[in-house]
Swiss-Prot record:
Induction: Is slightly up-regulated when the bacterium is grown on t4LHyp or t3LHyp as sole carbon source. Belongs to the proline racemase family. It holds the Pfam family Pro_racemase. InterPro entries: Pro_racemase_fam. It comes from Rhizobium meliloti (strain 1021). It catalyses: trans-3-hydroxy-L-proline = 1-pyrroline-2-carboxylate + H2O. It comes from the Bacteria. The keyword Lyase applies. The keyword Cytoplasm does not apply. This is Trans-3-hydroxy-L-proline dehydratase. Gene3D superfamilies: Diaminopimelate Epimerase, Chain A, domain 1. Its EC number is 4.2.1.77. Substrate binds at G91, S92, D252, G257, T258.
Length: 342
């Protein structure tokens, strides 16, 4: 076999959402911080295109690049590449990365509990892994500070009329709509319509509401639309359905850890969730993430919460992505039959 490029990947999924991890073959990008390195990847695009575009990737795939940490307290660092964005943080991807690091032996596992610190582009996240028989069975992630931005904002969406939405940040930026008010019961056969409408709502929110992180001037758009199910109080705590539309038009198979963090921030801002509560988010495929609020803080003078999320991930395989020098599509390709819901 001849190849001008070979990238080594361990594939994984967290509660259904693919989060592959590049473990070799890619040099650390330039930049003095992990955030600056992630901005270089977002601008330069070559690596993103190679691993996310067909024939090696697709709209269903997220890919994480392991890089040497910059912060002295971090055990490892990672840069998240999603279909359209290179975000500050991701819940499902942090769970995949933690699982790959421990299950593959890149970082030493200690049973029954391993504690590590990861450096995401948006900052440090503390991780606690429950481990047994050489497997990281459940990952607990102390996510970035999360906050409600707007409550009950009015958003005009062409063809849908005026919607009442919340906006929030949970490590990534969300516009949140009431799923029931949109006519959704959050069932698997609604995925196409949720993806299609969610992209329209996100685009409208970017055009008419806008988002600016108060401490990160580079992050100034909404990434996702969360269709939020009703919150029910059970013997085990709070429980709610969740479906997140991801650009350019797919639904997260997991309950989305940053969405869970954003929703907890909104519920706390409304006085509907306290530090003693636990919220379980349920995805369209029935997988779950669990969340709780560890404390409160401020982000740019705005009230915020310190969320913890937890979930499971599994390694699905190993891959070597190669580039034959005669391949006429060195960065791959994409078509609108899959890249963008209509």
């Amino acid at each position: 076999m001849r190849s001008t490029k070979t990238i080594h990947v361990i594939s994984a999924h967290a509660e259904g959402e693919v989060g592959d991890v590049i473990v070799g073959g890619v040099a650390p990008p330039p930049g003095d911080t992990i955030w600056e390195q992630s901005r270089w990847i977002a601008r330069e695009q070559t690596l993103r295109n190679f691993v996310l575009n067909e024939p090696r990737g697709g709209v269903f795939r997220h890919v994480n690049l392991l890089v040497p940490p910059k912060h002295p307290d971090a055990d490892a660092a990672f840069i998240i590449m999603e279909p359209e964005d290179t975000p500050p943080m991701s819940g499902s991807n942090s769970i995949c990365v933690s699982t790959v690091l421990l299950d593959s032996g890149i970082l030493p596992m200690k049973e029954p509990v391993t504690e590590i610190t990861l450096e995401a582009p948006g900052g440090l996240v503390r991780v606690r892994a429950e481990c047994r028989d050489g497997k990281a069975e459940r990952i607990f992630v102390e996510n970035l500070p999360s906050f409600a931005e707007r409550l009950d904002a009015k958003l005009e969406v062409e063809g849908l009329g005026t919607l009442t939405v919340d906006t929030a940040y949970g490590g990534d930026s969300f516009v949140i709509v009431d799923a029931a008010a949109m006519g959704f019961a959050l069932k698997p056969d609604e995925a196409h319509d949720i993806a299609r409408l969610g992209v329209r709502i996100t685009n409208a929110a970017n055009a008419k509401l806008g988002f600016h992180h108060p401490e990160n001037p580079d992050w100034r758009h909404f990434s996702f639309c969360l269709f939020a199910g009703p919150v029910e109080r059970t013997a085990e705590g709070l429980r709610a359905g969740a479906a997140v539309a991801i650009q350019p038009g797919k639904v997260d198979r997991s309950p989305t850890g940053t969405a869970l963090s954003a929703r907890m921030a909104v519920l706390h801002a409304r006085g509907q969730m306290g530090l003693s509560d636990r919220l379980t988010a349920v995805s369209l495929i029935g997988s779950t993430f669990s969340g709780r609020i560890l404390g409160t803080t401020e982000v740019g003078g705005r009230p915020a919460v310190l969320p913890e999320i937890s979930g499971r991930a599994w390694i699905t395989g190993t891959h070597q992505h190669m580039l034959d020098p005669s391949d006429p599509w060195p960065e791959g390709y994409r078509l609108t039959d899959t890249w963008g819901a209509r």
